[in-house]
Amino acid sequence: MAENHPYDPNDVAACRSVLVEALTVLGKYRDRIAVVGGWVPELAIPGQGHMGSLNVDLALDVAQFPPNVYETIRSDLLAAGYTPTDIPNRFERKVPGNPTPVRVDLLCGEYAGERSGSTHEMVQGMAVWKARGLDLVVWFHTKIRVSGTLPDGGRNDVEVTIPTIPAFLCMKGILLVDRKKDKDAYDVYFCVANFPGGLKALSSDFQPMLSNNLVQEGLRNLRAKFSTIEDIGPVWAARVAVEAGADEEFARRDAFEQINRLLDLLKIPKHGQPA
């Protein structure tokens, strides 16, 4: 069964409002918190028709936080109207006029703290979800500004750290192996198709990162998942692109061709070929 993508503009606007508010509430930690996940394409390449996201993912640079900060983060979120959920690292924020609460997840990379088989990192008494590939935002990031109206009113403009587009693509490449979510493939397609300066500029931005093992893992995964026009990468990307007004057949072929041209420029072996 195809995944449903209910990206109602009101829900997206509510989520952006919560994104700006969460970054406002946690402003004193802005140098140690990054926005990751589905908002990155719209924030990094605005005005090109990306649909945004319905949840907020915040990656915490665990190594850079002094003692007792995590309890302060939790307290700050609770005081601002965020409610905890049954999932330890997840909060929700109700937005006036919108029936669906916005989800806010606190995440960290696998190498941020103690190595264990647990899905969560317990830091100063607060659970943070460990996600493979998130360490890339600590190593390869940029700063931008994002503005919006807060849920309770008033506009604000805040500085935020996001992964570079090359890092983001590798993070999504890792996720394409770990879960089934059509929008992961769409986000890859959108960033590659709309990168300022085109594929050669994007390839150039990748060059300083290519010796990194997580980068190589993500790129190899992209090669595997976009190996043919029938693979899940192009198919999932096209399903979501239709919601943005694209022709599904064109989007599927374009996603396949663009991602593979990029991977050719980066000299990533064809799927099934030795490295």
PLM features: residue spans?
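Compositionally biased terminal segments of proteins
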Residues: 1-275
